[in-house]
Design a protein with these regions (language model features):
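A short, flexible loop at the N-terminus of ABC-type nucleotide-binding domains that lies
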Residues: 1-25
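Helix-to-loop junction immediately C-terminal to a conserved catalytic motif
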Residues: 54
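Conserved ABC ATPase "signature" region
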Residues: 101-119
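Conserved ABC ATPase signature
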Residues: 123-127, 131
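Conserved beta-strand-loop-alpha-helix hinge in the C-terminal portion
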Residues: 205-232
């Protein structure tokens, strides 16, 4: 028997209190684990979609189906890192009912998975931006989430930290045992080269999945006339 799709969204609709529609009959499916990316202009509904999947917002219509626990990773990790040390931050994410040794083991494993071994007692304010983003991902892993929702996680990082964060999520979503499913919003077209599928969101609708390289070429073709016009003008 085939495993259920990690995520299925059916005719999802959402409007803000001011009446502005953010999503309108948005439907798509992530067919398997891996790294899946969304691009789109500001206001196209990308971030709203992630918050609906994470359960932070309630849809006006439609359904979300997933057998996985979801966790949202924000653009700015300072918005979700609340406690003074790495270990105390991860304690917030752990399931209830664990023994002291189980909590310690879970924290150690989560930090090891994101390349932060040995930093359990490190003060969060001493971490670099890239390390903070890794810690935010470690919190998702410690919570036993296997559906990562990443809202432009590299937007505030330097190029080296950006590449490291992308490689980390790529590895976690392609590991042999229990690979994660990651839905990643980006404005950096070069990041699409690492994904298993990419799609464009426009006016609350999501287009079909295609390869990252194909989408790069499509978007480059759309931008070329605009750039040419600016040069001529």
């Amino acid at each position: 028997m085939a495993s259920p799709a990690p995520l299925t969204v059916e005719r999802l609709g959402f409007a803000w209190p001011n009446g502005r529609t953010a999503l309108n009959h948005c439907s798509f499916q992530i067919p398997k684990s891996g790294l899946w990316m969304l691009v789109g202009s500001n206001g196209s509904g990308k971030s709203t979609l992630l918050r609906l999947i994470a359960g932070l917002l309630t849809p006006r219509s439609g359904q979300i189906h997933t057998p996985l626990k979801a966790a949202l990773v924000f653009q700015n990790p300072d918005h979700q890192l609340l406690l003074p040390s790495c270990s105390s931050e991860l304690l917030l994410a752990l399931p209830e009912g664990l023994s002291s040794s189980e909590r310690s083991d879970r924290i150690h494993t989560a930090l090891e998975q994101v390349g932060l071994s040995g930093l359990a007692q490190r003060s969060i304010h001493t971490l670099s931006g890239g390390q903070k983003q890794r810690l935010a991902i470690a919190g998702a892993l410690a919570s036993e989430a296997s559906l990562l929702l990443l809202d432009e996680p590299t937007a505030l990082l330097d190029p080296s930290s950006q590449a490291d964060a992308l490689e980390l999520v790529h590895q976690l979503s392609h590991r042999t045992e229990q690979p994660l499913t990651a839905l990643w919003i980006t404005h950096r077209l070069e990041e699409l080269q690492r994904c298993d599928g990419a799609a464009v969101m426009e006016e609350g609708h999501m287009g079909p999945w295609q390869s990252g390289q194909a989408l790069i070429q499509q978007l480059a073709g759309q931008l070329a006339p605009l750039q040419s016009g600016r040069a001529e003008g």
